[in-house]
Amino acid sequence: MKMNPIVELFIKDFTKEVMEENAAIFAGAGLSMSVGYVSWAKLLEPIAQEIGLDVNKENDLVSLAQYYCNENQGNRGRINQIILDEFSRKVDLTENHKILARLPIHTYWTTNYDRLIEKALEEENKIADVKYTVKQLATTKVKRDAVVYKMHGDVEHPSEAVLIKDDYEKYSIKMDPYIKALSGDLVSKTFLFVGFSFTDPNLDYILSRVRSAYERDQRRHYCLIKKEERRPDELEADFEYRVRKQELFISDLSRFNIKTIVLNNYNEITEILQRIENNIKTKTVFLSGSAVEYNHWETEHAEQFIHQLSKELIRKDFNIVSGFGLGVGSFVINGVLEELYMNQGTIDDDRLILRPFPQGKKGEEQWDKYRRDMITRTGVSIFLYGNKIDKGQVVKAKGVQSEFNISFEQNNYVVPVGATGYIAKDLWNKVNEEFETYYPGADARMKKLFGELNNEALSIEELINTIIEFVEILSN
């Protein structure tokens, strides 16, 4: 779905930052509230009642928590228990949490006490190095995939959580290493603030420090907020006041070079994150295929075709995932390595991911899992040839068919190159007959290019150019 130009530009720019590993996420309370956790105001409602205040009339909840402690001789035990009870509840992750965990982002900051970010990363089989004490900053978890900085503490240690006014006043001394770490990330990374209200005194202090140091050279950051809507029975004047206040708030964020993306509803956050994820995934191609013979192709020409196709995909900045299919995989490797080593002068492990299939009976039982693991990393699946030897006869490879089914199930764009024959031709016929199902809304150019993928009269160069042009349209 096409969004307004400001959102489209943000998606394009932030996708680039994620792919270049310059992106970071700052998650606020709004992200956690979407799973069913109550707001901070609702959490403190019984505390306010106990000291004779109405939480609905209080804007400064940090001071409210401090008042409660003052009235109880500095004892915050009940508040600690409320935090533990609320944020220890088992809840389901939202799609936003899942997408944020799937993205190739390695830095997450949050003021939330809950463990939703860690849980989301764990479900993606990523190792999270969680930090919520000063001492933890000095250690590094082995083979970590992401660092989660919980600058206000963790639910399992509520007595240490940053909560009352005293905590905020002492933060710059007690938690100074966190201030320095966040300041450094704000300088070197592009942040996306999600579910954040920017009322936190600590973040305001850190942003001000960065602004003072860099003035007009601050790095661009982004935040997603929902535009104000008129409440039932709200006076027009009150609504206009809130709208004006939001306009001034957005203008103030620009002092810190934070670009605000205003949304009509919170569902748009999921749509935007899905677009970013899809943009990233379509830059990684799954090459599916196996062959003991190559249809009308001479073996030498087929090997050259696979070699050159892989090389050209890398040259066009696509990454490749392959299962090392017989008669295909080795030529994929050669093409990729030639482009990376000979022409680009470097070999990056992310550019080619190989997942050779396990052998033996036990391995066969794991093949579906292996296929899903490979394909989930990609956004486009290209299918070549697809044959094997079975009982001395050349037969169509069911494994390539399985990879097609999984690819479509996981919303990958499927690109069967029918001109290579065998299963690939069967798959091309299937997609061609139901083109609108596989490519809804595709224009005449895409339809024409797809038709050319079945043209056996094309030269190797012409067929490769057609594949590349088709895949580039998908990635854009």
UniProtKB/Swiss-Prot annotation:
GO CC annotation: what is one?
cytoplasm
Q: Which residues bind 3'cADPR?
A: G289, S290, L326, F357, R371, K388, G399, E403
Residue span(s) of domain Deacetylase sirtuin-type: 4-283
Q: What is the effect of changing R371A?
A: No resistance to phage SPO1, no oligomerization in absence of signal, a little bit of dimer seen in response to signal
Q: Which UniProt keywords apply?
A: Antiviral defense, Cytoplasm, Hydrolase, NAD, Nucleotide-binding
Show the segment(s) annotated as SLOG (STALD) domain, binds 3'cADPR. Answer: 284-476
Please describe what happens when the gene is knocked out: When this gene is missing the Thoeris system does not confer phage resistance in B.subtilis.
User: Where do the annotations place NAD(+) binding?
Assistant: A23, D114, H152
Residue positions of the active site: H152 (proton acceptor)
| EC code | 3.2.2.5
- Where it mainly occurs, coarsely classed, is cytoplasm
Its BP terms in the Gene Ontology are:
defense response to virus
The cross-references to Pfam families, in alphabetical order and at most eight, read: SIR2_2 (PF13289), STALD (PF18185)
Q: What class of enzyme is it?
A: hydrolase
GO molecular function terms attached to this record: hydrolase activity; nucleotide binding
What activates or inhibits this protein? Activated by a molecule generated by endogenous ThsB (AC J8G8J6) or ThsB' (AC J8CSK2); activation in vitro is 50-100x more sensitive to 3' cyclic ADP-D-ribose (3'cADPR) than 2'cADPR. 3'cADPR activates the NADase function of ThsA by binding to the SLOG domain, which changes its tetramer organization, allowing NAD to access the active site. Also activated by a signal molecule generated by B.dafuensis TIR1 (AC A0A5B8Z670) and TIR2 (AC A0A5B8Z260), and by BdTIR (AC I1GTC2), a plant protein involved in defense against bacterial infection.
Tell me the compartments it is located in: Cytoplasm
Q: Could you tell me which PROSITE patterns the record lists for this protein?
A: SIRTUIN (PS50305)
Hey, what's the signal peptide range on this chain? none
In the UniProt annotation, what is the result of changing N112A?
A: No longer confers resistance to phage. Loss of NAD(+) hydrolase activity, no longer binds NAD(+), oligomerizes correctly. No change in NAD(+) levels during SPO1 infection, still dimerizes in response to signal
Q: What is known of its domains?
A: Has an N-terminal deacetylase sirtuin-like domain (SIR2, residues 1-283) and a C-terminal SLOG (STALD)-like domain (residues 284-476). The SIR2 domain has NAD(+) hydrolase activity. The SLOG domain binds 3'cADPR; binding alters the protein conformation, allowing NAD(+) to access the active site.
**Role, per record:** NAD(+) hydrolyzing component (NADase) of the Thoeris antiviral defense system, composed of ThsA and ThsB. Activated by a signal molecule generated by endogenous ThsB (AC J8G8J6) or ThsB' (AC J8CSK2, probably 3'cADPR), by TIR1 and TIR2 from B.dafuensis or by BdTIR from B.distachyon (AC I1GTC2, probably 2'cADPR). Upon activation binds and hydrolyzes NAD(+), leading to cell death and inhibition of phage replication. Not seen to bind DNA. Activation is 50-100x more sensitive to 3' cyclic ADP-D-ribose (3'cADPR) than 2'cADPR.
What is the similarity comment for this entry?
Belongs to the soluble Thoeris ThsA family.
Quaternary structure (record): Homotetramer formed by dimer of dimers; homooctamers are occasionally seen. Not seen to interact with ThsB. In the absence of the signal generated by ThsB, 63% monomer and 20% homotetramer; in the presence of the ThsB signal product 40% of the protein is dimeric. Homotetramer in solution; probably dimerizes via the N-terminal sirtuin-like domain.
Q: What's the name of the protein?
A: NAD(+) hydrolase ThsA
Species = Bacillus cereus (strain MSX-D12)
